[in-house]
Amino acid sequence: MFIKRITILAVLILEISVVSANRLSLGAEATYSPTLLTVGDSTSLLSDAGISLSISYETERLRYSSFFSFDKGWEHHSFHRFSRLNEISSMAFSSSIGYLIKENLSLNADIGLKLISVGVQPNNIRVLSPFIGVILRKEFFSKENTPNFALFVPIEYTFGKTAKGVSLGIGVGCFFSLPKGEIR
């Protein structure tokens, strides 16, 4: 039921964006984030690498975005004798709103849900956890109707009952923007 509501929300965001956007963007991003994560009674320091697909629409000062991402984590150090986090991956759906601080530089607030998988199938454990984040994003535009690029610094906090963590990362993205007249 919850997944159905999220899907309906994503479709509504897409429909609203087509009608009201000054600019609609489709993008792909890659991130690397050192992460301190606790799942159950296991706490580890991880390197987390991820890829995401996004759709965004913008007004004069604001950007609204939806993301679907997949991440893979590698354990560097466990704070327990026996670690369960040496095999970990996650999928996430999130939405963000960004405010244009100055030309091509924006501050974004992110909220979403993350499905964390720990261990090797078929004995893996899956945990659904909410997260919030802040993203500082700098965009670099090329010619109109060509791919553009962005650098960004995400800070993320996961706060579920079973899974808790914090990460600070760096990322790069490629996005393609369509002027409003070309959306239809």
Task: Report residues per predicted region.
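Residues embedded in well-ordered secondary-structure elements
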Residues: 7-10, 15, 42-44, 84-86, ...
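A detector of low-complexity, intrinsically disordered, Ser/Thr/Gly/Pro/Ala-rich segments
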Residues: 1-6, 11, 33-36, 133, ...
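Gram-negative (and chloroplast) outer-membrane scaffold detector with strong preference
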Residues: 54-149, 153, 157
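Cleavable N-terminal export/targeting peptides
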Residues: 1-25, 181-184
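Short glycine/proline- and aromatic-enriched beta-strand/turn motifs that initiate or cap beta-hairpins
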Residues: 20-78, 167, 173-179, 183-184
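Short, exposed beta-strand-loop hairpins at the edges of beta-sheets
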Residues: 160-162
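Terminal low-complexity interaction tails
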Residues: 137-142, 146, 155, 165-184
